[in-house]
């Protein structure tokens, strides 16, 4: 990769965006930023608390402001929250300001990867988390596909291998 163009990772919770993003940034010598971590740092509170106090709408407003700001930086690998693409503005920011990689995974893999994670507000205090994941996938998967320059399944490979695959795919795109 000759120039350090922004790389934006989108996909559902549990797809591996943060893990793969860290690997990718390390290999490329780029800055890694996780939007959820950035939101928590700026708010001085975790995402579950923000959801409890401000609701999902309040959280999404914070997320949109941060994505608008961060996507204007140069040479970053940005891991977005699973619902970031619901916002048309976010989809526009991501598409216009970098290469968007959709890290695709199955609902079953998502469920396995998130079932013990207490930092997933949309999966807390629900009767059937798997059904929630299926419902989210129906709404969000077409939006991930819409915004993606590259779609990459993440179910069976290591983060380092996935990061190297992304580099190869971006090089082949000649973006």
From Swiss-Prot:
<feature type="binding site">
    <location>
        <position position="60"/>
    </location>
    <ligand>
        <name>substrate</name>
    </ligand>
</feature>
<feature type="binding site">
    <location>
        <position position="120"/>
    </location>
    <ligand>
        <name>ATP</name>
    </ligand>
</feature>
<comment type="function">
    <text>Catalyzes the specific phosphorylation of the 3-hydroxyl group of shikimic acid using ATP as a cosubstrate.</text>
</comment>
<dbReference type="GO" id="GO:0008652">
    <property type="term" value="P:amino acid biosynthetic process"/>
</dbReference>
<dbReference type="GO" id="GO:0005524">
    <property type="term" value="F:ATP binding"/>
</dbReference>
<feature type="binding site">
    <location>
        <position position="36"/>
    </location>
    <ligand>
        <name>substrate</name>
    </ligand>
</feature>
<comment type="pathway">
    <text>Metabolic intermediate biosynthesis; chorismate biosynthesis; chorismate from D-erythrose 4-phosphate and phosphoenolpyruvate: step 5/7.</text>
</comment>
<keyword id="KW-0057">Aromatic amino acid biosynthesis</keyword>
<keyword id="KW-0028">Amino-acid biosynthesis</keyword>
<protein>
    <recommendedName>
        <fullName>Shikimate kinase</fullName>
        <ecNumber>2.7.1.71</ecNumber>
    </recommendedName>
</protein>
<feature type="binding site">
    <location>
        <position position="157"/>
    </location>
    <ligand>
        <name>ATP</name>
    </ligand>
</feature>
<feature type="binding site">
    <location>
        <position position="140"/>
    </location>
    <ligand>
        <name>substrate</name>
    </ligand>
</feature>
<keyword id="KW-0808">Transferase</keyword>
<dbReference type="GO" id="GO:0004765">
    <property type="term" value="F:shikimate kinase activity"/>
</dbReference>
<keyword id="KW-0547">Nucleotide-binding</keyword>
<dbReference type="GO" id="GO:0005829">
    <property type="term" value="C:cytosol"/>
</dbReference>
<feature type="binding site">
    <location>
        <begin position="14"/>
        <end position="19"/>
    </location>
    <ligand>
        <name>ATP</name>
    </ligand>
</feature>
<feature type="binding site">
    <location>
        <position position="18"/>
    </location>
    <ligand>
        <name>Mg(2+)</name>
    </ligand>
</feature>
<keyword id="KW-0418">Kinase</keyword>
<dbReference type="Pfam" id="PF01202">
    <property type="entry name" value="SKI"/>
</dbReference>
<feature type="binding site">
    <location>
        <position position="82"/>
    </location>
    <ligand>
        <name>substrate</name>
    </ligand>
</feature>
<dbReference type="InterPro" id="IPR027417">
    <property type="entry name" value="P-loop_NTPase"/>
</dbReference>
<keyword id="KW-0479">Metal-binding</keyword>
<dbReference type="GO" id="GO:0009423">
    <property type="term" value="P:chorismate biosynthetic process"/>
</dbReference>
<keyword id="KW-0067">ATP-binding</keyword>
<dbReference type="InterPro" id="IPR000623">
    <property type="entry name" value="Shikimate_kinase/TSH1"/>
</dbReference>
<dbReference type="InterPro" id="IPR023000">
    <property type="entry name" value="Shikimate_kinase_CS"/>
</dbReference>
<dbReference type="GO" id="GO:0009073">
    <property type="term" value="P:aromatic amino acid family biosynthetic process"/>
</dbReference>
<dbReference type="GO" id="GO:0000287">
    <property type="term" value="F:magnesium ion binding"/>
</dbReference>
<comment type="similarity">
    <text>Belongs to the shikimate kinase family.</text>
</comment>
<comment type="subunit">
    <text>Monomer.</text>
</comment>
<keyword id="KW-0460">Magnesium</keyword>
<keyword id="KW-0963">Cytoplasm</keyword>
<dbReference type="InterPro" id="IPR031322">
    <property type="entry name" value="Shikimate/glucono_kinase"/>
</dbReference>
